[in-house]
């Protein structure tokens, strides 16, 4: 490693930790328990306050809320950010909110992502003040007009998302919804998972994503980039 690269690592700020999954299982594997503890350790190491979590398995709201409560108790001082994903056991804002609310935990919150939002066919006018208070962070990107088939929707999520503002789903509108709801996200993440963009090379992919993200934020929420 060069001195320049080492200095870059020292100066780099880690803002989020992920990804805890399978937290609803009655008998969690050693690997999942270890991964969970590693996430807690990474929060301590890097000074991060919340952990992104997903759930692929589909259970009732009541059961999921109980398991979320148990996870939040294990997390202690750290916030558990539940991320609704359309192909998961928490497919949309409605179920995500119901689970978080029913858990009764102060450190149970929501993470909202542009791609997951639009692929769940949700309009930009359904955030209530009560739900808004439980949003810890957001992730922005964009999507094509037509989604992949439901059976392979996760493939689109993992390989073919678009940079903010470069697709058909109005990333700026998503950001404005967050702003207008009075949400103060701890993190505004840029989650562009794209084989095509990454195939251009890391430098070009980073520059392209940064430039388009900046355009969206300057349009929708200029205070974030001032």
Question: What residue spans do the PLM features occupy?
Answer:
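Short helix/strand-capping connector loops at secondary-structure junctions
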Residues: 186-198
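Short, flexible loop/turn segments with low-complexity composition
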Residues: 191, 222-226
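Short, glycine/acidic-enriched loop or turn micro-motifs at the edges of active sites
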Residues: 21, 86, 116, 142-145, ...
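Active-site acidic/histidine proton-transfer and metal-coordination neighborhood
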Residues: 8-110, 119, 201-208, 212, ...
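Conserved residues at the C-terminal ends of beta-strands
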Residues: 54, 141, 191
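Conserved, mostly hydrophobic/aromatic
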Residues: 43, 80, 113, 138, ...
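Alpha-helical scaffolding within the catalytic cores
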Residues: 1-5, 35, 173-174
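Gly/Pro-rich active-site loop or hairpin
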Residues: 30, 93-94, 118-185, 199-204
């Amino acid at each position: 490693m060069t001195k320049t690269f080492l200095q870059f690592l020292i100066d780099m700020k880690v803002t989020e930790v992920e990804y805890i999954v399978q937290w609803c299982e009655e008998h969690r594997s050693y690997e999942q328990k270890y991964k969970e503890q590693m996430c807690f350790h990474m929060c301590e190491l890097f000074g991060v306050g919340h952990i992104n979590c997903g759930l692929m398995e589909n259970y009732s709201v009541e059961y999921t809320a109980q398991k979320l409560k148990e996870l939040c108790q294990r997390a202690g001082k750290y916030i558990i950010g539940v991320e609704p994903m359309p192909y998961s056991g928490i497919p949309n804002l409605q179920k995500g909110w119901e689970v978080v609310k029913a858990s009764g935990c102060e450190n149970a919150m929501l993470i909202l992502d542009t791609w997951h939002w639009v692929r769940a066919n949700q309009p930009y006018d359904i955030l209530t003040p009560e739900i808004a208070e439980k949003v810890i962070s957001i992730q922005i990107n964009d999507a094509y007009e037509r989604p992949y088939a439901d059976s392979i929707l996760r493939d689109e999520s993992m390989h073919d998302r678009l940079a903010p503002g470069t697709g058909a789903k109005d990333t700026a509108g998503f950001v404005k919804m967050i702003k207008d709801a009075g949400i103060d996200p701890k993190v505004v993440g840029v989650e562009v998972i794209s084989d095509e963009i990454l195939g251009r090379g890391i430098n070009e992919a980073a520059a392209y994503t940064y430039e388009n993200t900046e355009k969206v934020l300057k349009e929708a929420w200029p205070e974030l980039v001032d």
